Amino acid sequence: MTVTGQVKWFNNEKGFGFIEVPGENDVFVHFSAIETDGFKSLEEGQKVSFEIEDGNRGPQAKNVIKL
């Protein structure tokens, strides 16, 4: 299931961050889940669509697309 959220924060040096989803817990996002060519990064406040999977430490984003 694809959901839409907004990037809460993303650390380019560490390569991860979190996405806010209304009515849900924040979702962890790793740079490897971002669907783009070149440098994979997200900006705070940016809208994204993605799928949620169960990661080792809770919900994790996959197939992240910048909107």
Swiss-Prot record:
SUPFAM superfamilies: Nucleic acid-binding proteins. Coiled coil: none annotated. The keyword NAD does not apply. The keyword Chloroplast does not apply. GO terms for cellular component: cytoplasm. Residues 5-64 form the CSD domain. Homodimer. This is Major cold shock protein CspA. It comes from Bacillus cereus. The lineage of its organism: Bacteria, Bacillati, Bacillota, Bacilli, Bacillales.
